[in-house]
């Protein structure tokens, strides 16, 4: 039985992953987001500016029977198209039209997948997405630009089956210091933005 250990960083001490919950405008749409990196989960737990400590919940995901889409194994343009489905890089009519064509050409139908795995995005990625669909960024350098961020890999639990295979390891709940890890989160984010601009 193949399993993967994942972490969920959150301001909430009590978390119940529930099918159908979550924000539509996250990178891969509605779902429950986790990472294999404990350090990233700690940063994500305190990424809000409210100066409160956060929590990292540890989970075990049984993956044998799950259909997983890993964007690291796909064309980078397919990943970018997936982000465009859920997050608006611009509210201009021209961008929306171009983004629609881009999604139609490069997008992957993710509806049959139980889990989506891939890079995490921040605002810098959407700047690049906007410039790319406007033909201001060459495809030859797109992958290099997108790999500069270093914002980590995330898993998004999508299906009822995947939720049923996710089990929290309750005695591994970890409190995260806001003062220590919020600064790390902000530094990582600022460095990703700087690399995108340079």
Regions picked out by a protein language model, each given a short descriptive name:
Residues 2, 26, 47-52, 62-198:
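Conserved NAD+-utilizing ADP-ribose enzyme module
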Residues 31:
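Catalytic centers of nucleases
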Residues 1-28, 46, 57, 192, ...:
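ADP-ribose/NAD+-binding catalytic cleft of ART/PARP-like enzymes
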